[in-house]
From Swiss-Prot:
Transmembrane segments: 1-23, 31-53, 100-121, 130-151, 180-203
Family in the record: Belongs to the protease PrsW family.
UniProt enzyme class: hydrolase
CC annotations in GO: plasma membrane
Annotated keywords: Cell membrane, Hydrolase, Membrane, Protease, Transmembrane, Transmembrane helix
Residues in compartment: Extracellular: 54-99, 152-179
Organism expressing this protein natively: Shouchella clausii (strain KSM-K16) (Alkalihalobacillus clausii)
Main subcellular location: membrane
This protein's encoding gene: prsW
The protein, known as: Protease PrsW
Role of this protein: Involved in the degradation of specific anti-sigma factors. Responsible for Site-1 cleavage of the RsiW anti-sigma factor. This results, after two other proteolytic steps catalyzed by the RasP and ClpXP proteases, in the release of SigW and the transcription activation of the genes under the control of the sigma-W factor.
A molecular-function term among this protein's GO annotations: peptidase activity
Cell compartment(s), UniProt: Cell membrane
Membrane topology: Multi-pass membrane protein
Biological process (GO), any one: proteolysis
């Protein structure tokens, strides 16, 4: 059991450390980061219940609808809502870059529990290869989401646009990831590898941009 917990936590902690050590935030308190991480973790069960019910009823028979609505919209929409309520509205963003730290926290909290459940179901050896790409992808969704929520807090003239981008872009990225995974069959790696490269280039770009903003 200890090995399962450590294996589930390791990818998330590595990615979180990467973002944390880049110093894109300033004075974000770690207990707030931990709270948002836990909130992300608690989202897993209700989301999985909804996804299971919708899948059983075949609500979204087309792979694209399932990828973008049942996975992208549901997961990223709820994560965005948690960030909006617990970070944005409660005044926890002390500078624009702090949004990235909170965005990564909620995403990796979700990914950690998701990984743990997968490992319990399929075993450690079968699960480890599966956890690397999804955890990385979740981190990127969180970076993009947090970047735009942070911008919305400090750029009042374009607040609505940034909040909207903070929701829509992660939904599209997540939906694209799941659509590739479910629809490309034997050719999935040919599509997934360049897609992941694009994701990480996008994440690095947002991290660099966020590090230049101060208030």
């Amino acid at each position: 059991m200890v090995s399962l917990v450590l294996a589930a936590l390791a990818p998330a902690m590595a990615l979180f450390s990467y973002v944390y050590l880049r110093d894109v935030y300033s004075k974000a308190k770690m207990f707030l980061v931990l709270r948002i991480f836990i909130i992300g973790a608690l989202l897993v069960v209700p989301i999985l219940v909804i996804q299971f019910a919708f899948t059983e009823e075949n609500v979204f028979p087309h792979p694209a609808a399932k990828a973008f609505l049942l996975y992208g919209f549901l997961e990223e929409g709820l994560k965005w809502l948690m960030l909006f309520v617990f970070a944005y509205q409660h005044g926890q963003l002390q500078r624009p870059g702090d949004g990235i730290l909170f965005g990564v926290s909620v995403s990796l909290g979700f990914a950690t529990v998701e990984n743990g459940l997968y490992m319990i179901a399929y075993g450690l050896e079968a699960a480890i290869p599966r956890t690397v790409l999804p955890t990385t992808a979740h981190a990127v969704y969180g970076i993009v989401m947090g970047y735009y929520i942070g911008q919305a807090k400090y750029k009042e003239d374009h607040k609505k646009m940034f909040l909207l981008l903070g929701a829509i872009l992660p939904i599209l990225l997540h939906g694209g990831y799941d659509f590739i995974l479910s629809s490309f069959g034997h050719y999935v790696l040919y599509a997934m590898i360049p897609f992941m490269v694009i994701l990480w280039l996008l994440a690095i770009w947002k991290l660099k941009k966020a590090s230049r903003f101060t208030v």
